[in-house]
Swiss-Prot record:
Originating species: Streptococcus pyogenes serotype M28 (strain MGAS6180)
Entry's Gene Ontology BP terms: regulation of translation; translation
PROSITE patterns: RIBOSOMAL_L1 (PS01199)
SUPFAM superfamilies, alphabetized: Ribosomal protein L1 (SSF56808)
Segments passing through the bilayer: none
GO cellular component: large ribosomal subunit
GO molecular function, one term: structural constituent of ribosome
The family this protein is said to belong to: Belongs to the universal ribosomal protein uL1 family.
Keywords assigned by UniProt, alphabetized: Repressor, Ribonucleoprotein, Ribosomal protein, RNA-binding, rRNA-binding, Translation regulation, tRNA-binding
Gene: rplA
Purpose of the protein: Binds directly to 23S rRNA. The L1 stalk is quite mobile in the ribosome, and is involved in E site tRNA release. Protein L1 is also a translational repressor protein, it controls the translation of the L11 operon by binding to its mRNA.
The protein, known as: Large ribosomal subunit protein uL1
Source domain of life: Bacteria
Record's subunit section: Part of the 50S ribosomal subunit.
InterPro entries, per the entry: Ribosom_uL1_bac-type (IPR005878), Ribosomal_uL1 (IPR002143), Ribosomal_uL1-like (IPR023674), Ribosomal_uL1/biogenesis (IPR028364), Ribosomal_uL1_3-a/b-sand (IPR016095), Ribosomal_uL1_CS (IPR023673)
């Protein structure tokens, strides 16, 4: 613990907490200050000046990062018949119906993404209390309730991320690993930023992006100048 604290102090000394860095500077600092012994994830965080209590200011969606996330996604699909076969052919890790519902209700959660065809939502809805709090419930807005299960599986395997503003207007997203080349992290960051910018509600008032930052797992939070994106 003392060693980790020493590493954190050393990392903090390299970052000016009063400064908003350019995206290139921020990414370089994330890589430089990372002290995790594993290939840490890199995440961005946005504090948006929105009121999610208003229906027209709720922000939620999905996108495919140009350079992927570096994370292997275990994809579960609720489908039957031909659609189940399509999901398997596309690379889904788990495909089923009521059998999967029973397994999940029994405590099994070894998957990262859940996709369902519309006709399966009647049985998937039984898992609301399990999947909902974990942000795993299939939703049309994130492309996880769809008849095109093959495309959904391929996108999830290929770097698709989902995002959602919480009650305080905060949005977090994984954009890669510290092992990524800096230019690939920058490209992923800019792609996500573009999505956030376009998601601005027409009724939002004041400065839309109150704060933007980037960090690695166990790392230091680094402020980013939105204008550099």
């Amino acid at each position: 613990m003392a060693k980790k604290s020493k590493q954190m102090r050393a990392a903090l000394e390299k970052v000016d907490s009063t400064k908003a860095y350019s995206v290139e500077e921020a990414v370089a600092l994330v890589k430089e200050t990372n002290f995790a012994k594993f290939d840490a994830s890199v995440e961005v965080a946005y504090n948006l000046n929105i009121d999610v209590r208003k229906a027209d200011q709720q922000i939620r969606g999905a996108m495919v990062l140009p350079n992927g996330t570096g994370k292997t996604q275990r994809v579960l699909v609720f489908a039957r018949g031909a659609k189940a076969e399509e999901a398997k052919a596309a690379g889904a890790d788990f495909v089923g119906e009521d059998d999967l519902v029973a397994k999940i209700n029994g405590g099994w959660l070894d998957f990262d993404v859940v996709i369902a065809t519309p006709d399966m939502m009647a049985i998937v809805s039984r898992l609301g209390r399990v999947l909902g709090p974990r942000n795993l419930m299939p939703n049309p807005k994130t492309g996880t309730v769809t008849m095109d299960v093959a495309k959904a599986v391929e996108e999830s395997k290929g770097g698709k991320i989902t995002y959602r503003a919480d009650k305080a207007g905060n949005v977090q997203a994984l954009i890669g690993k510290v092992s990524f080349d800096a230019d690939k992290l920058v490209e992923n960051f800019k792609a996500f930023h573009d999505v956030m910018a376009k998601a601005k509600p027409a009724t939002a008032k004041g400065t839309y992006m109150a704060n933007v930052s980037i960090t690695s797992t166990q790392g230091v939070g680094i402020k980013v100048d939105p204008n550099s994106l």
